[in-house]
């Protein structure tokens, strides 16, 4: 919304149209799977100043689909945008890339991803860092920790916890021994 208020043209690429609650009339929506390179090339004709890769399969049960959407999708996007030279390519990584590394983590912390999702995110980060080092690709990688906010799906951690607390019910959680530097 803020990008639109600033007068920016916003384009969203997704395999599905946005839910009604998230639909914004001034956004150009392109239905396309970023894991399918030919389709992606066909759908991305113009240049963009800024690219923010929020893409990826949310349900991590299907490991192959999870890997493809997060890693192969990122590689396909960068292949296209290497030729279009955006001002910045922002990759949404994950705190999961660190795995159980000692907290607090920083950019020099050892990464030990434990899930296919985290492995795909780390491979994407390594791919992007390599592009930066070899081709000066303008990348910024953000490793977010429990991002949440308005209009978030109810099947995510923070909404699950809030809903359970309101209803005075138990919610799934760990033993609480993890430390995260937010």
Model-derived segments and spans:
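Active-site YXXXK catalytic motif of short-chain dehydrogenase/reductase
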Residues: 70, 117, 121
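Conserved glycine-rich Rossmann-like NAD(P)H-binding loop of the short-chain dehydrogenase/reductase
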Residues: 8-17
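NAD(P)-dependent short-chain dehydrogenase/reductase
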Residues: 126-181
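Conserved sequence/active-site signature of Rossmann-fold short-chain dehydrogenase/reductase
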Residues: 35, 97, 147-149
